[in-house]
Amino acid sequence: MQQPLYGLIGGKLGHSYSKIIHEKIADYTYELLPLPTEAEARTFMERRAFAAINVTIPYKQFVIPYCDVVDPKAQSIGAVNTIVNRDGKLYGYNTDYAGFAYLAGVHGVDFAGKTVLILGTGGTHSTVTAVCRDGGAKEILTASRTGKGDALLYSEAMHRPDVQIIVNTTPCGMFPNVGQCLIDPKAFPALEAVLDVVYNPFRTELLLRAEDCGVTAAGGFEMLVAQAVFATEHFTGRQLDTAAIIPAVSRELRHQLANVSIIGMPGCGKSTVGAALAKRLDKKFVDLDAEIERRTGHNIPDIFAQEGEDAFRRYEADVLAEVAKGNSQVIACGGGVIKSPANTRALRQNGPVLWVRRPLEALATGGRPLSKGGAALKQLEAERTPLYEAASTVVLENNGSLGEAVDAAVKLFETDEKL
């Protein structure tokens, strides 16, 4: 007997965590069902050969005519992201509304009396608008690339200093095109919070810039988990303890998917601690220097000797930009990786940055182009310590045995509230 089909339809699903989430909270198998063209989506919907599905970009509006019954909230929003097949009849719902409301609430973002700027005009825009409107927002502005209709151009939106909350509903900054950003939060002196519905990476460039401004910044991962839990209630017809399940699943999966990036002085034990930590956390270990050597075909001392430090830093930045896009890794970085702000931002996007500190006299300096010991090493430490402080989110004192260091690193990771 064929198993009932549960899954997610959308144009591109390579970035999706939905399968992991649904199979964590329910007992059905959940499939990712990419439908690159509208013709394929039309055929899929006409066949109705599924028990229940979620719907993502670009089909949240496309699927509405195929639903026999559309929930009033989904109808008013004009977007459906959850469809349940009950005896051949399709029922459409919108759980993104409750998911986004959860995200805002859990981070203390209150729309009442606020001026809100929403980036993008796609299907998620209408959902976010509804939540902001129902939350009592004073004014809701929209910005887009084209500025059509009532929307501002992004350049025009930058001249609204009264904006207090920004919500990104576009795919800008989403994997694999990380690093992209539509506006600069620094342009908004009254800014209090930035929310981004993008969930991969955990922190988009927009959110990293918002964090640098000292305002509340939250990505879409908790929204993703919340809407999945609410969708599961529709799928199964059972009420769940959402108040307990959503934060528990969010935290568990973030720990499973997060990277741990390790920085520190040359010879402080980054690779040794990193390899052991990766084993303990069941994550892939990446030694960034070894990866640079693998990709360039040259060892690092030779790169420094033959091409100079600037050339090495370019190789390092290129390799790191690709590696940091991944998930569930422990990344041991070279000692000078923090010299580039772009590098530290790449490390921050998917997890904590762990600064390994070790007494200067205990550093291993053999085969390291920039750390020869003595006065030069002291000077290097003095130059880099402020950079390590600025780049790191947690600090590990590596003064004892390897086992002690790894135990401490695991504890820091598991108790990191910023994760």
Located regions from the model:
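Adenosine-phosphate binding glycine-rich loop
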Residues: 197-258, 398
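Rossmann-like adenosine-cofactor binding region
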Residues: 150-218, 337-343
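NAD(P)-binding Rossmann-fold cofactor-contacting core
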Residues: 134-152, 289-296
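Phosphate/diphosphate ligand-binding glycine-rich loop within oxidoreductases
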Residues: 2-107, 201-203, 213-216, 220-225
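A glycine- and Lys/Arg-enriched "phosphate-lid" helix/loop adjacent to the NTP-binding pocket
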Residues: 349-387
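NTP-dependent small-molecule kinase module
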Residues: 244-255, 276, 280, 326, ...
